[in-house]
Amino acid sequence: MKAVIADGQNGVEVISDAPKPTPEKGEFLGRVIRVAFNPIDWKTLYNASIEKGTVGGTDFVAVVEDVGEGVDRSKYIGATVSGWAPGPLDGSNAAWREYITLDVNLVYFVPKNITPSQAATLPLTFTTASQGLNQYLGLPLPPTDGSKNSAQQKWVLVWSGSSSVGQYVVQLAHHAGYKVIATCSPHNFDWIKKLGADFTVDYHDPNVVEIIKKATDDSVFYGFDAASFPETSTLAVKAFSSKVKDGKLINILSSPPSPRSEVKIIGIIDYSLFNREFNFFGNKIEPIQASYDHAVEVYKKLTGWLQEGVIIPNRVKEFDGGLQAIPKALREFASGKHSAVKFVVRID
């Protein structure tokens, strides 16, 4: 079986003798037809400390060919599903290979109204967005009966609204009934507003904090920093309302000190939803049952949200060529010379 692995020289290579996995109890075996890139893919594989031979890849779309014990064959065999695997943090269960196995509860069925490439843009970053906004901040998920959540006067600030995570945070916050203000580059303003932002701000503007406060009438009470750099989190916290008593800003991976005591920065790690422990370059990531339960609930509802147009996938930059195309495409992705698009490689 072909797979893409770390080459031990801060790069990746394609091999043809990787072992084909076998589904265990509660799992499926799928033939991978699409993979999408996330920053963790290149940041872990382009790293001298990663073990040579580690298989890469997180987001995938696959056609189910077999299932393990306890899985309804009539429901899954032949179905097209999408999810994300632990990837480089667990090289034995990663997406950049011809076949993949995973817990059937951690994938969603791809609806007919979106393409496999669009489907590949969702799993990891949508999970991250929902984990932060819905699980940790407690904002309601979009209804599944066509109704709408009650409108709120409070604002949610999304820093880096045009990132893959940010685009899904904007949509989830909008459907939660909150007003949304997002930072991004001006050329992405229209797209981010289409996704649900009420106001967009150029994050390059030296007066970005003051602009946010004025646009929201000093009413930002929740925030999500999808960039999660120390400087972006600091600016985001400063933009919170002067009236806030218990503000919360979601940060991906870490919980840096907050410049305001009344605003807490909450670090989230989406790998906690897997039922095992990970070592993230010396930092232990332990499983959290609530994160698994939340992911299962979200994946059950995601197919319907996509069918109804409640959730819009990221825009796609697609690469042909199968697994052999990944090394070159990954280098382009790592260069950072792209905006508001998800890199997807066709494997079939």
From Swiss-Prot:
Q: Which UniProt keywords apply?
A: Mitochondrion, Oxidoreductase
Q: Which GO terms describe its molecular function?
A: oxidoreductase activity, acting on NAD(P)H; zinc ion binding
Which SMART domains does this entry report, sorted A to Z?
PKS_ER (SM00829)
Where does the record place it? Mitochondrion
- Kindly give the CDD domains that the UniProt entry links to this protein: enoyl_reductase_like
The record's annotation in Pfam families points to: ADH_zinc_N
EC id: 1.-.-.-
Q: Which GO terms describe its cellular component?
A: mitochondrion
In terms of Gene3D superfamilies, this protein maps to: Medium-chain alcohol dehydrogenases, catalytic domain, NAD(P)-binding Rossmann-like Domain
**What is the top-level taxon of the source organism?**
Eukaryota
Say which family it is in: Belongs to the zinc-containing alcohol dehydrogenase family. Quinone oxidoreductase subfamily.
PANTHER family per record: HYPOTHETICAL OXIDOREDUCTASE (EUROFUNG), ZINC-TYPE ALCOHOL DEHYDROGENASE-LIKE PROTEIN C2E1P3.01
Q: Supply the name of the protein.
A: Zinc-type alcohol dehydrogenase-like protein C2E1P3.01
Give the source species: Schizosaccharomyces pombe (strain 972 / ATCC 24843)
Its ancestry begins with: Eukaryota, Fungi, Dikarya, Ascomycota, Taphrinomycotina
